């Protein structure tokens, strides 16, 4: 998924799903659209702590001042949840990521109502990992 769908389109599409099964399939579909995860990023430093499944995230701050998101998981649903979180963070500046809260979006979509407690914890871990990565990129940019 080189270019994510916009937040508004995601919310519209997700909300138009008639039942949880359709939403679940849509989440998996989003995960399948993620850009391939480069093997060189598949290391322990990019492994998301607190996820039951092996899941990786890597952020690149490009010369265009855009953030390139990479994510992968050995769970289809977690991979889709990573894609959703990337969609919600799309077009944010590094500094905005530090204060961005995904919870209102999850509440609006009732997403956490349909997930197991461990998946909800995984969402929190993914969000924290993205904030940590953004903070590291900000520090690196200020030093360079």
UniProtKB/Swiss-Prot annotation:
Pathway entry: Cofactor biosynthesis; iron-sulfur cluster biosynthesis
Gene: sufE
Subunit note: Homodimer. Interacts with SufS.
Stated family: Belongs to the SufE family.
Record-level GO BP terms: iron-sulfur cluster assembly; sulfur compound metabolic process
Cellular compartments per GO CC: cytoplasm
Location(s), subcellular: Cytoplasm
Protein name as annotated: Cysteine desulfuration protein SufE
Enzyme active site: 51 (cysteine persulfide intermediate)
Source organism of the structure: Wigglesworthia glossinidia brevipalpis
Key words of the record: Cytoplasm
Function: Participates in cysteine desulfuration mediated by SufS. Cysteine desulfuration mobilizes sulfur from L-cysteine to yield L-alanine and constitutes an essential step in sulfur metabolism for biosynthesis of a variety of sulfur-containing biomolecules. Functions as a sulfur acceptor for SufS, by mediating the direct transfer of the sulfur atom from the S-sulfanylcysteine of SufS, an intermediate product of cysteine desulfuration process.
Predominant location category: cytoplasm
The keyword Membrane is assigned to this record: no
One protein family per Pfam: SufE
InterPro entries documented for this protein: Cysteine_desulfuration_SufE, Fe-S_metab-assoc_dom
